[in-house]
Amino acid sequence: RIMTFSNIRVKGLGSLHKPVIAIGPYIHYAECMLNSEEMNSLKKELGKTLLFFPTHTCCEGGLEYEIHCMIDELLELKEKLGFDTVIVNMYYLDENKNGFGDLYNKAGFKVTTAGHQLDINFLNRLKTIILLSDYTCSNSIGTHTGYCVYLGKPHLVINPVQTLEEVNPLWRDLWETFEKDSSQAQVDKRLLASKYWGFDCIKSREEMRALLI
């Protein structure tokens, strides 16, 4: 039995000839690692916060990007929208690659990671990091995109690592929409994220228990 986000992904996995079930965004089932008092205290300390997810560069299928251009873009967005803090959530293997983590730190950003994706607390950490933010952005579309939208955080693709022509046609509508920042785009982003991450496929605790046991 395979679990995935959405019905559109269920169709894509049909060739595996195994039962495939859509359960919505996995982040729904994660727990924030801070209680409300701790969360409020940290949010007060951070102020208005921009959260950036740089594309992975160390894993299979990773994409390289020009970090100095990325830092300039983030500083411009920080100034434009009046953020007090910029948090960069890096893939755990990328933090020390080419000194990227140090460069982000020198720019005045806070660098963090949710850790290895197979760590039992990976999603709990990721959910906590996202909930601390007021606005999120990335230079690519990834799992984080749908998670941010699901958790009610605006998301924008800036300085993208691929052109629309380079993007897989299956995901081109996501890239094209998330590069826009209009009021209508926010509505379209929610609709697309729901389609690909299965916001309407969430299971109850009892339903999940029945699937897992």
Model-identified regions with their sequence ranges:
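Donor nucleotide-activated moiety binding/catalytic core segment of transferases
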Residues: 95-151, 155
